[in-house]
Amino acid sequence: MLIYLIAGEPSGDLLGGRLMAALKERLGEGVSFAGIGGESMRAEGLTSLFPMTELSVMGLVEVLPRIPKILRRVKQTISDIETKRPDALVTIDSWGFNGRIQAGLKARGVPVPRIHYVAPMVWAWKSGRTKTLARVLDLLLTLLPNEPEWFEKEGLKTLHVGHPVIEGAASRGDGAAFRVRHGFAPDRKLLCVLPGSRHSETAKLLAPFGETIALLARRFPDLAVVVPTVETVADEVSQAVKSWALPSMVVRGPEKYDAFAACDAALAASGTVALELAMARLPAVITYKVSPVSAFIATRFLGLSLKFVTLVNILVDEAVMPELLQDDCRPDKLAAAVEHLLTDEAARALQAAGARRALEKLGLGGESPGKRAADAVIDFIRQGKEQRNG
């Protein structure tokens, strides 16, 4: 059984890696893989058609210069799928790229089951997107329990498989071991800083984060900074932190979970990492910034409308994690919010309680989402073969 998988960013790559591991557990040597992915998927045996980093871009204006190359990659990917004729295509998140792949295959009549993993946020965007997905997909796998109803009413078979953060290692970090390894005293305050996993994110956030650290240095001269990062942006992050006003250490790979357990608070770009911080019970301030033009287009013309952007807050409909977005992504505001979490135990406890409620809504304590997704893919392929052989 050949499964073709496509991930366009690190969070999708992590999902893809867990899905591949579960498929191998279920099928053993009876499954092989092709497609596009990053370090997690490569670790499970994928040879990526081209570097996933070419697709890791966020923001409407930021993506414009990349469009010609991205469209060439779309054409290349469709051609590769036509040649390989896999038993199923599983695209993971990144609908801007993956939607073009799915639509292109349908338009060409390529006989491959078309599966997408991670639903676009239809409550944030105009709900007409549900019709778009229903036209080009055969099966949709969702992370959130309320999502299937949006798509099933359009006739798209949709299954909720759960959010992978609940099965990850974020809650199992060893903070004491991390402090010993890196020479941090047990009582020294540590701040975890996460400036994003895309170049378009770090380009907007590294500078204000550096200024935030300078402000915090005045209030907490003994504070140390730990910066977990990913391969896509590791070089630029490592270069940027050299000029920060506090001792700043960059860590990569799974050590980030030990870092989460060791730290006292976090400053993070909005994204999947907010859920990981919740799992690690690490109080966090969440921020994000895109170009003003991107923000204007998204709200005015594309119908983006959100009370919150952080999934923890969305799930419980309250500001559990402070959000400082766009014009509020300012060093003075970021520093004040971080200081509050470093010094106010009541605020830390309140955030932990709210985060726990959000995680329970994602299925904390239930069956592994990766295994549920693998079972859904296998069952769908087998059902299709049975119908064709009828």
Curated annotation (Swiss-Prot):
HAMAP family: LpxB. This is Lipid-A-disaccharide synthase. GO terms for molecular function: lipid-A-disaccharide synthase activity; phospholipid binding. Condensation of UDP-2,3-diacylglucosamine and 2,3-diacylglucosamine-1-phosphate to form lipid A disaccharide, a precursor of lipid A, a phosphorylated glycolipid that anchors the lipopolysaccharide to the outer membrane of the cell. SUPFAM superfamilies: UDP-Glycosyltransferase/glycogen phosphorylase (SSF53756). Pathway: Bacterial outer membrane biogenesis; LPS lipid A biosynthesis. It catalyses: a lipid X + a UDP-2-N,3-O-bis[(3R)-3-hydroxyacyl]-alpha-D-glucosamine = a lipid A disaccharide + UDP + H(+). Keywords: Glycosyltransferase, Lipid A biosynthesis, Lipid biosynthesis, Lipid metabolism, Transferase. Its EC number is 2.4.1.182. One of its GO terms (biological process) is lipid A biosynthetic process. Belongs to the LpxB family. GO terms for cellular component: membrane.
